[in-house]
Amino acid sequence: MTQTTSQTESKWFAPEEFESIRQRLPILYVDAIPVRVDGQGMITSVGLLLRVTGQGKISRALVSGRVLYGERVRTALLRHIEKDLGPLALPRVPPAPAPFTIAEYFP
């Protein structure tokens, strides 16, 4: 069993173990672009996160994160939206979200 830092004991790996796994297996992540829409469904605002890079510069980022083993994509989206935007974000995510696009990242 690995050490954990959260309540999801069996779903987290130690950093060294995770790095080894990333080199051998594909790992599912979700990226989301939060938007605000008006009464007619037209996009009025697009949200990006501001993050500080390792060099101390400000950069923009998407809401994103790993999908846990056995977790539904919708649940992962809601978890990462709440983590990045706070519990009052109140996102409207469809019951069965379909990907807009699929991208492949290489560490």
Positions of the model-derived regions?
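Short, flexible active-site-adjacent loop segments at beta-strand->alpha-helix junctions, enriched
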Residues: 38, 52, 106
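A generic structural signal for short beta-strands and their flanking turns/coil linkers
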Residues: 28-30, 56-58, 96-98
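Generic structural "secondary-structure junction" signal
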Residues: 30, 62-64, 69, 104-107
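Residue-level signal for pocket-adjacent positions within structured domains
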Residues: 8, 13-16, 55-57, 62, ...
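Acidic, metal-coordinating catalytic segment for phosphate/diphosphate chemistry
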Residues: 2-40
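Residues in well-ordered beta-strands of folded domains
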Residues: 33, 50, 103
